[in-house]
């Protein structure tokens, strides 16, 4: 099993020294991610590609899945490598591998060549294509938009047959740019903005301002862990949780209603700046988009920026909501965001869209800044890899079972795609399907005389959701784990 990884085009136009540095970092990132699949996978870097080889064919699907989610990869090819003797031998091997694909189809042959040979790339394409055309009567050559494209590469004395091409997510390798701190709320915007900075090469740490209790924190941790595990697990990152309820209480008590939204955001960036400074992070990332809500007008954004000297990045500033939701759907955070409550918008009934600096500063003079100092000082920092471990500790009161009682119902909370691809079949118990993102709104509609055993593939999501339901007052919930 061999994969040839092609670099994101912007990497290839860098100077020689920068290009080499980027390729080294990308190679290291790939090794870090693939190391979880075993130590038999080798990763070798070259000037214009990176080669991944494993002798274990059973890992092919897992390797493909991992490579499609590593920033810095434009696309990669799953290939077979052979030696060859001459042009006719190239045709014979190519036809043996792909001849059956062109029956009753239009096709073309595309060849790339590196090294010194007695033939050109065009000659290879014509010879191999002509051979296909002669040996398969139902096939027809079509150079533009054919049904089948036969791809092959010739490198010195090696023939490389391309079995499949997979698209990567592009961008720069994580670690080529400086670290950032994302203010994550669990909604559409903060998840997408975090992803966009990871894709641009920054290691993204997460800062969460808790306004809604432990249930809110559990939900946001799910999103942050998902983003890290899916796109950024080549690096260690921090998850910092700040209990912001005392700050909100002080704002509600002392700040004029119309100024509350801007003041709250200014307090958040002040706190985030201190957290960023503590960990040597260069910039803050937010999911703000121009004009989306009252605090996101140019006037208000400028006042929010004035509260700190730390750079604030807003990758979604010109995006509309529909586009943001589409990206969230593509990266897999839409289901989380759909049921995540928005707490910032509930504290002000008549927010100003054009705050005045003098008024904001006058209102902030009423604020007891020792409260802000205290919540930052007591902020909880954890390695994001420990979220799964912490979840296990948190839900010790939630029973885990592998056998069924008379009144039990197994609730498959995986996504519809996972349920369809790998149906849960159990004997002696009723199995119902309810995706995790619908639990908060539909669990209460279930028969409360039953005990529900939550099931997911790895157990982490079911534990988090069990704790979340317990927080809502549902005690008829356990976690099901297969024997």
From Swiss-Prot:
Limits of the THUMP domain: 61-165
Enzyme class: transferase
Residues engaged in binding ATP: 183-184, 265, 287, 296
Classification via Pfam families: Rhodanese, ThiI, ThiI_fer, THUMP
GO CC terms: cytosol
UniProt KW keywords: ATP-binding, Cytoplasm, Disulfide bond, Nucleotide-binding, Redox-active center, RNA-binding, Thiamine biosynthesis, Transferase, tRNA-binding
Alphabetized SMART domains for the sequence: THUMP (SM00981)
Catalyzed chemical reaction(s): [ThiI sulfur-carrier protein]-S-sulfanyl-L-cysteine + a uridine in tRNA + 2 reduced [2Fe-2S]-[ferredoxin] + ATP + H(+) = [ThiI sulfur-carrier protein]-L-cysteine + a 4-thiouridine in tRNA + 2 oxidized [2Fe-2S]-[ferredoxin] + AMP + diphosphate; [ThiS sulfur-carrier protein]-C-terminal Gly-Gly-AMP + S-sulfanyl-L-cysteinyl-[cysteine desulfurase] + AH2 = [ThiS sulfur-carrier protein]-C-terminal-Gly-aminoethanethioate + L-cysteinyl-[cysteine desulfurase] + A + AMP + 2 H(+)
Active site per UniProt: 456
Main location as per UniProt: cytoplasm
Cystines in this chain: 344-456
Function: Catalyzes the ATP-dependent transfer of a sulfur to tRNA to produce 4-thiouridine in position 8 of tRNAs, which functions as a near-UV photosensor. Also catalyzes the transfer of sulfur to the sulfur carrier protein ThiS, forming ThiS-thiocarboxylate. This is a step in the synthesis of thiazole, in the thiamine biosynthesis pathway. The sulfur is donated as persulfide by IscS.
Record-given protein name: tRNA sulfurtransferase
Species: Proteus mirabilis (strain HI4320)
